């Protein structure tokens, strides 16, 4: 955990100095768990409750910082499905847990695609079977949470890097092909 904290410190580019220890993080996590546990006990409800949490505008704005919404909506449904595991893992990580209905809404909001539950739920079940997600069954829904954040990002990052590399290679080939086409057009024009 200390290595992870050190990596986080390096990634944060701020002028302010931050100091915290593993015990500080443990205290925060314990306090957060106890406050949720106490609130649950005070309700006197024996079955676990889950409150839907829509993807925040801040999270959507983060993505809009890279691509505007209209561009995200031009991404083909089959491309969204091809990257669905990575998309689901990242959305669940952003939310700190989600049910399938919320994830379907998030995908619709981000990509403008209307995937069926029959497409999304098998991916969620597979990710849970692979140990990437913890699944909690409640009365009317299943809630999915990232089981190991570090392992998740170690899985997602190479997949994203492969996709970016593939896209860059295609873009470079397209630019080269277009340049050759223009050169051929000029040569033919000069010969006339």
UniProtKB/Swiss-Prot annotation:
* Keyword annotations: Activator, Cytoplasm, DNA-binding, Transcription, Transcription regulation
| Notes on how activity is controlled | The amount of protein that accumulates is controlled by GvpD; GvpD causes a reduction in the amount of GvpE, preventing accumulation of excessive amounts of gas vesicles.
CC annotations in GO: cytoplasm
GO terms of molecular function: DNA binding
- Pfam families given for it? PadR (PF03551)
Instruction: Output the InterPro entries linked to this UniProt entry.
Output: ArsR-like_HTH (IPR011991), Tscrpt_reg_PadR_N (IPR005149), WH-like_DNA-bd_sf (IPR036388), WH_DNA-bd_sf (IPR036390)
Instruction: Look up the domain of life of the source.
Output: Archaea
Region labeled Leucine-zipper — which residues? 150-181
Instruction: Cite the binding residues for DNA.
Output: 140-145
Subcellular location, in the record's words? Cytoplasm
Regulation: induction:
Transcribed from mid-log to stationary phase, probably as a gvpD-gvpM RNA. Highly expressed in 25% salt, poorly expressed in 15% salt, no gas vesicles are formed at 15% salt at 15% salt. Accumulates in late exponential to stationary phase (at protein level).
This protein's assembly is summarised as: Interacts with GvpD, also with c-GvpD from H.salinarum.
Its biological function? Plays a regulatory role in gas vesicle synthesis, activates transcription of the gvpA operon, and probably of the gvpD operon. Gas vesicles are hollow, gas filled proteinaceous nanostructures found in some microorganisms. They allow positioning of halobacteria at the optimal depth for growth in the poorly aerated, shallow brine pools of their habitat. Expression of a 9.5 kb mc-vac DNA fragment containing 2 divergently transcribed regions (gvpD-gvpE-gvpF-gvpG-gvpH-gvpI-gvpJ-gvpK-gvpL-gvpM and gvpA-gvpC-gvpN-gvpO) allows H.volcanii to produce gas vesicles.
> What miscellaneous comment appears in this entry?
Encoded in a 14-gene locus called mc-vac.
Q: What is this protein called?
A: Transcriptional activator GvpE
């Amino acid at each position: 955990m200390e290595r992870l904290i050190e990596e986080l410190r390096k990634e944060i580019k701020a002028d302010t100095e931050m100091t915290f220890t593993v015990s500080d993080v443990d205290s925060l996590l314990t306090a957060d768990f106890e406050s949720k546990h106490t609130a649950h006990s005070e309700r006197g409800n024996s079955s676990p409750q889950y409150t839907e949490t829509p993807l925040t505008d801040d999270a959507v704005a983060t993505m809009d910082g890279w691509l505007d919404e209209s561009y995200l909506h031009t991404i083909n449904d089959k491309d969204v499905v091809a990257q669905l595991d990575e998309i689901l893992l990242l959305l669940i990580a952003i939310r700190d847990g989600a049910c399938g209905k919320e994830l379907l809404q998030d995908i619709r909001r981000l990509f403008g695609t209307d995937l069926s539950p029959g497409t999304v739920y098998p991916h969620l079940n597979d990710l849970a079977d692979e140990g990437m997600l913890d699944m909690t069954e409640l009365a009317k829904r299943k809630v999915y949470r990232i089981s190991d954040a570090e392992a998740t990002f170690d899985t997602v990052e190479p997949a994203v890097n492969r996709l970016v590399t593939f896209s860059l290679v295609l873009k470079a080939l397209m630019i080269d092909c277009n340049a050759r086409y223009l050169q051929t057009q000029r040569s033919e024009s000069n010969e006339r």
